[in-house]
């Protein structure tokens, strides 16, 4: 009379496996990025917590705008196209963030970071909007609860692992660059 908590047949579905991959990679990188950015801004750039928080306003605003339009974009194009577009925009934002740190260094402010963090936020919302749609694509109604629980649990686990992994990478880079945050994040 044994019934597995997770029906094994769900793990055989390509969409669920891809959703698991997205959850583990994307959400761990995302939470690690947010942790390392906050640490860099407060400890490295000497920003007060409120200044560091204000540096993410552009990210939040563009995330909201992107999330508002994402369902219409997905309906018009496709979930996969919007996922890839979100990844491209987010990568562009991260590259812009690296360039911003190279140009402004220790003189960065919420204003100098806004264009890059705005791109990151816009891409982020497109990716998150695509995540559950892809992971749940092939799920039958009877399995919806278990499948969404798999994806949600892995999302939360990845969000917890990200700061530990990327925080360790940042601290190692700081040791190699003698505590210079500008060099460590580049």
Language model regions located:
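12-transmembrane solute porter fold
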Residues: 3-176, 186
